């Protein structure tokens, strides 16, 4: 069963995909946002191509666990994804995933330009891997 992981931002959507057994996550692309309809179209194409059965979306909570304005945007977009693509959506607490992704890239000594290109895809990978680890227990 393939599972898609998403890190949804205002300008980009990081996308990660599980292996067929649902054990490991791998970043596959970063979608540059071009409007709701086109974003959904791209996500649907990815879901169709890889025969995705579930989508895990990172939910950006505040450090105290409350939901802020960005969370509301993400929840609204995820509701639209669920309606249009017709796949179940699971929300995953994404606190500190971008921080962890940036830290890993700094430790790998990647340049700022290279980090900027892949940070969202890496954050999506962290989100999806966290979910996969949880469901495998």
Swiss-Prot record:
One GO CC term, this protein: cytosol
Keywords from the UniProt entry: Cytoplasm, Hydrolase, Nuclease, Ribosome biogenesis
InterPro entries: RNaseH-like_sf (IPR012337), YqgF (IPR005227), YqgF/RNaseH-like_dom (IPR006641), YqgF/RNaseH-like_dom_sf (IPR037027)
Domain of life: Bacteria
Primary localization: cytoplasm
Family: Belongs to the YqgF nuclease family.
One Pfam entry name: RuvX
Compartmental location: Cytoplasm
Protein name: Putative pre-16S rRNA nuclease
Disulphide bridges, residue numbers: none
GO terms for MF: nuclease activity
Record-listed E.C. numbers: 3.1.-.-
GO aspect biological process, one term: rRNA 5'-end processing
Broad EC category: hydrolase
Protein task: Could be a nuclease involved in processing of the 5'-end of pre-16S rRNA.
